[in-house]
Amino acid sequence: MAVRELPGAWNFRDVADTATALRPGRLFRSSELSRLDDAGRATLRRLGITDVADLRSSREVARRGPGRVPDGIDVHLLPFPDLADDDADDSAPHETAFKRLLTNDGSNGESGESSQSINDAATRYMTDEYRQFPTRNGAQRALHRVVTLLAAGRPVLTHCFAGKDRTGFVVALVLEAVGLDRDVIVADYLRSNDSVPQLRARISEMIQQRFDTELAPEVVTFTKARLSDGVLGVRAEYLAAARQTIDETYGSLGGYLRDAGISQATVNRMRGVLLG
């Protein structure tokens, strides 16, 4: 029976649940593992996961804590973006979009007076974020490591904070590299929308904890209103924006993989492992 819950995390799944051409038990995805409890750790052991690819930035790890995984599981810190050589903000993509919503002064007609205008602005911001994904420092390194681990036959769980944006990007490229149809790739990606309520609750909690005293009711209302589905959910056009950047900058996914140092032989081995 497929395991569909990871206690202490959310947005968890075996990618093979949706991408049924994949062998089960090879590629998993989830939110952060910083609150994994004993039952969650037991689940990881039962699933036979050997490696965790943590795509969070160093600041996210410091702020939220490392993954609480069992001994014997290798954790690969693959910050995306990697600020060791990049001056960009190291917030999670949805956090960056959320900050833009909070600080927007309405000068561009995006004052957020209605829920629809907030969601429209959020969608634009998230699309902009995804458009930059392929060229962000750390993106190709993260993809290279995940592909290499999978090609070596090691069951991998990939995660970021929410398990939807950076994780969604990396998983989508893995699935495309092994030859899965676009509709299957998008179907797995969109499943993260089922976890929006948990993400909204977690972010609301984080916002509250950043203040020494309880927020004024009007501030809470203003803030929560900007936790729109455009920021917290995923859309097919977000993934398409990232994919367009790959084609425009590298010519094709193959070109992107080669630039990342991923050989065709490695891709072939990964395909053999994942498809059987």
From Swiss-Prot:
The consequence of inactivating this gene is: Disruption of the gene impairs the ability of the mutant strain to survive in activated murine macrophages and in guinea pigs, but not in resting murine macrophages. Infection of guinea pigs with the mutant strain results in a 70-fold reduction in the bacillary load of spleens in infected animals. Disruption of the gene has no significant effect on the morphology and growth of the mutant in defined liquid culture medium.
The answer on whether this UniProt entry bears the keyword Glycoprotein reads: no
Tell me the organism. Mycobacterium tuberculosis (strain ATCC 25618 / H37Rv)
SUPFAM superfamilies, per database record? (Phosphotyrosine protein) phosphatases II
What does the record give as the active site? 160
The annotated site for Important for substrate specificity falls at 164
Q: What is the lineage of its organism?
A: Bacteria, Bacillati, Actinomycetota, Actinomycetes, Mycobacteriales
Write down what this protein is called: Triple specificity protein phosphatase PtpB
Q: Which reaction does it catalyse?
A: O-phospho-L-tyrosyl-[protein] + H2O = L-tyrosyl-[protein] + phosphate; O-phospho-L-seryl-[protein] + H2O = L-seryl-[protein] + phosphate; O-phospho-L-threonyl-[protein] + H2O = L-threonyl-[protein] + phosphate; 1,2-dioctanoyl-sn-glycero-3-phospho-(1-D-myo-inositol-3-phosphate) + H2O = 1,2-dioctanoyl-sn-glycero-3-phospho-(1D-myo-inositol) + phosphate
